[in-house]
């Protein structure tokens, strides 16, 4: 995917297989910023279903075997993007090479968006009304009818998303190449302090400013659904807060009362189900999807089964995470014991 001399022909082959004609691909150039997948931007002209199209597109594909930081499925990501498109502000997915027959690796093509990365936008424009728009984005995502989502999305095997996530903490500790006692501690703490349940919904699992853009109208655009599952929607709120500790600002903390009030209004959740203490709980629980992937690939690297400098770099994130988990559990314990207001 990095060679601009061969990729236009491969993209042409994919579009041709989808029934497009009069195909012209130009301006192919790899993009930076992709965390787990290879990405490139290109210009395209083609005719499909009797309509002529011209625009900028993004190719998103798997890295070479043994170099992936996390393992995900382009076919499922494509299906999720198609299902959420009527409900969310996200770049439309257009074409899929599920087996890599044309591109050389499993890949999908999306429409390019001129929206700007969130953190640079905030540096230039300030926080503005992004906290409320974040609440509305999260609320819209978490109220998409589950029966409209792909059947391939993982559901809670135990019937309870919290039980599944707590079990993942335990399994990650067991499967790791080294002992991870803090993971066992976190699992026990999460089990002891469960909040009231809410209905399951789509969970993004990497819901952060890194996967959001701001468009020309100042609205949030959400991207990158490769880790999505069906689970407890509050996991996304906790993950957002956890990520913001490493990459501030925390838009939720700008005005938590207004954020939570708007989110509850959209979702219909009660104050008992969604409040600052519950978000602190999910700050810990909600990161395990990404944490387990990083820990697992770290084990594979230690065993000589995979190699990538990015893997070693991302293992350092686990050390930062451990400090955040301990701080969160200590703060919540104090609040539950009535030591703080």
Question: What role is predicted for each listed range?
Answer:
Residues 74, 131-134, 162, 166, ...:
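Hydrophobic packing residues in well-ordered alpha-helices of helical domains and bundles
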Residues 251, 290-341:
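ATP/Mg2+ or Mg2+-diphosphate-binding catalytic cores
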Residues 271-285:
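All-alpha amphipathic helical-bundle segments outside canonical DNA-binding/catalytic cores
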Residues 13, 17, 38, 79-86, ...:
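Residue-level signal for well-ordered alpha-helical scaffold segments within enzymatic catalytic domains
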Residues 6-23, 143-205, 268-271, 335-339:
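An alpha-helical support segment within catalytic cores of ATP-dependent transferases
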Residues 234-270, 285-304:
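Active-site activation/catalytic loop segments of kinase-like enzymes and analogous catalytic loops
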């Amino acid at each position: 995917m990095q060679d601009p001399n061969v990729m236009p022909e491969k993209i042409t082959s994919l579009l041709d297989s989808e029934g497009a004609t009069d195909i012209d691909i130009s301006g192919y150039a790899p993009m930076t910023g992709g965390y787990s997948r290879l990405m490139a931007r290109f210009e395209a002209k083609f005719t499909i279903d009797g309509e002529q199209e011209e625009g900028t597109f993004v190719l998103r594909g798997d890295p070479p075997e043994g170099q992936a930081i996390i393992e995900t499925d382009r076919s499922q990501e494509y299906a999720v993007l198609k299902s959420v498109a009527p409900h969310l502000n996200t770049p439309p997915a257009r074409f899929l090479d599920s087996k890599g027959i044309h591109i050389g690796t499993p890949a999908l093509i999306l429409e390019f968006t001129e929206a700007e990365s969130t953190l640079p936008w905030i540096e230039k424009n300030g926080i503005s009304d992004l906290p409320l728009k974040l609440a509305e984005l999260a609320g819209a995502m978490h109220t998409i009818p589950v029966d409209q989502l792909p059947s391939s999305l993982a559901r809670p095997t135990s019937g309870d998303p919290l039980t599944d996530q707590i079990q993942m903490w335990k399994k990650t500790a067991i499967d790791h190449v080294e002992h991870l006692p803090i993971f066992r501690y976190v699992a026990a703490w999460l089990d002891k302090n469960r909040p009231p349940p809410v209905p399951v919904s789509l969970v993004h699992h990497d819901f952060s400013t890194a996967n959001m853009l701001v468009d020309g109208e100042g609205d949030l655009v959400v991207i990158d659904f490769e880790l999505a599952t069906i689970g407890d929607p509050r996991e996304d709120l906790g993950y957002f807060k956890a990520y913001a500790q490493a990459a501030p600002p925390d838009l939720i903390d700008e005005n938590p009362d207004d954020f939570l009030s708007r989110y509850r209004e959209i979702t219909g959740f009660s104050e008992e189900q969604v409040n600052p203490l519950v978000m602190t709980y999910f700050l810990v629980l909600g990161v395990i999807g990404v944490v387990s992937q990083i820990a697992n690939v770290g084990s594979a690297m230690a065993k000589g089964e995979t190699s990538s400098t990015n893997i070693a770099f991302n293992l350092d994130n686990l050390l930062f995470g451990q400090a955040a988990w301990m701080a969160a559990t200590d703060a919540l314990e104090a609040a539950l014991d009535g030591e703080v207001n």
